[in-house]
């Protein structure tokens, strides 16, 4: 299957939510990893209690894989899990694990609980959880919240679960780390001398952008370290989706935010996706046969992305060259180990 099989569906001018661009369900039907092919697999989705994470769980549950979702609100997660599981009663029920990504100790506890319940098996880690730009605040661990939640907590979880990914890989299906990032990375590179953007002059948009750049750099460095061990990392931009809870830190309702942003950037009305379309790229990253054995790629619009040729216009696809800076990736990895209290990879 071609890596650009969905490109034609994105070439013509998009018509907004619910247009002809593919949904996660369509991607799954096209790949058809149903029944016994996936019944032996374990998938863990962070931020799986709402939005793109919940939609990914809903679609991937149809494969017959064992699905775990992580989230802060255990009650909300249990309802999502019950609703999805009831729609596919012949498949293993979805399980919920509580994890608050604003607290590193909660990440450690969540990892321990997952490994206990899964028996140490993990074929796909989908790092989906995150928050949007928000007023400055620090976590109890002393890190700026957007950086901690969007990047550092995920880095720690990846370190704790990497051995399970390695142990679970097979020649037929290499284990995958799927990192949900954002086109917002194009607004700023990281500053290796100042990861923690706190204090006077704090810019929430820059903090968000840097956290997303950091996530991509992490995925690329993971690929360099684990690719030859049969585990591959892919990062991606799901697109502009305003109906998810990632925007909970912004004022107003989704409708009022949509109206406000449409005025600021008219292209949003064309490029915005609904949740079903927004989850398509991360589901593709999980099930695509054409991505087997591949990693270190940045995906966008259900295809391998190209360099952005336009300034601004973050609703449009593409990446900035700084996501491929290996020196920054190596330094970020080493610095992150220190920040989360690990001397070396487990």
Swiss-Prot record:
Ranges of Basic and acidic residues composition bias in the record: 18-32
Pathway terms, separated by semicolons: Secondary metabolite biosynthesis
Keyword Oxidoreductase in annotation: yes
EC number(s) given by UniProt: 1.-.-.-
Residues forming the catalytic site: 181, 208, 212
Biotechnology: Calbistrin A has been reported to possess a number of interesting bioactivities including antifungal active against Candida albicans and cytotoxic toward both healthy and leukemic human cells.
Binding-site list for NADP(+): 52, 76, 100, 128, 208, 212, 241
Domain of life of the organism encoding this protein: Eukaryota
Signals that turn on the gene: Expression is induced in complex medium (Czapek yeast autolysate medium) supporting calbistrin production.
Gene Ontology molecular function: oxidoreductase activity
Keywords: NADP, Oxidoreductase
Region annotation Disordered: where it falls in the sequence: 11-33
Record function comment: Oxidoreductase; part of the gene cluster that mediates the biosynthesis of calbistrin A and related compounds. Calbistrin A is a secondary metabolite with an interesting structure that was recently found to have bioactivity against leukemia cells. It consists of two polyketides linked by an ester bond: a bicyclic decalin containing polyketide and a linear 12 carbon dioic acid structure. The polyketide synthase calA is probably responsible for forming the decalin moiety.
Family: Belongs to the short-chain dehydrogenases/reductases (SDR) family.
Protein name stated in the entry: Oxidoreductase calI
Organism: Penicillium decumbens
Gene name as annotated: calI
């Amino acid at each position: 299957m071609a890596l650009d099989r969905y490109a034609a569906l994105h070439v013509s001018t998009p018509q907004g939510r619910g247009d002809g661009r593919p949904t996660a369900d369509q991607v799954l039907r096209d790949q058809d990893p149903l029944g016994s092919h996936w019944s032996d697999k374990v998938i863990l989705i962070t931020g799986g209690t709402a939005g793109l994470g919940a939609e990914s769980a809903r679609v991937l549950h149809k494969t017959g894989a064992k699905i775990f979702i992580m989230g802060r609100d255990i009650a909300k997660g249990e309802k999502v899990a019950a609703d999805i599981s009831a729609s596919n009663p012949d498949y293993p029920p979805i399980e919920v694990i509580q994890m608050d990504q604003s607290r590193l100790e909660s990440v450690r506890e969540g990892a321990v609980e997952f490994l206990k319940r899964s028996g140490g098996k993990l074929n796909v880690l989908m790092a989906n959880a995150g928050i949007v730009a928000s007023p400055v605040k620090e976590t109890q661990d002393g890190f700026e919240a957007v950086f901690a939640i969007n990047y550092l907590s995920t880095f720690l979880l990846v370190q704790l679960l990497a051995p399970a990914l390695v142990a679970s890989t097979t020649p037929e299906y290499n284990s995958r780390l799927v990192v949900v990032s954002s086109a917002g990375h194009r607004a700023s590179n990281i500053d290796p001398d100042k990861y923690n953007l706190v204090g006077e002059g704090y810019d929430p948009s820059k903090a968000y952008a840097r956290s997303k750049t950091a996530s991509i750099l992490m995925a690329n460095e993971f690929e360099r370290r684990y690719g030859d061990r049969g585990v591959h990392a892919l990062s991606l931009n799901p697109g502009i989706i305003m109906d998810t809870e990632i925007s909970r830190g912004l004022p107003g309702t989704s409708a009022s935010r949509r109206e406000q942003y449409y005025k600021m950037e008219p292209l949003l009305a064309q490029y915005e996706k609904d949740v079903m379309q927004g989850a398509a790229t991360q589901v593709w990253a999980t099930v695509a046969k054409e991505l087997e054995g591949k990693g270190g790629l940045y995906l966008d619009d259900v295809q391998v992305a190209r360099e952005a040729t336009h300034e601004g216009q973050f609703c449009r696809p593409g990446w900035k060259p700084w996501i491929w800076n290996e020196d920054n990736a190596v330094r970020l990895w080493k610095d992150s180990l220190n920040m989360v209290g690990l001397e070396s990879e487990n």
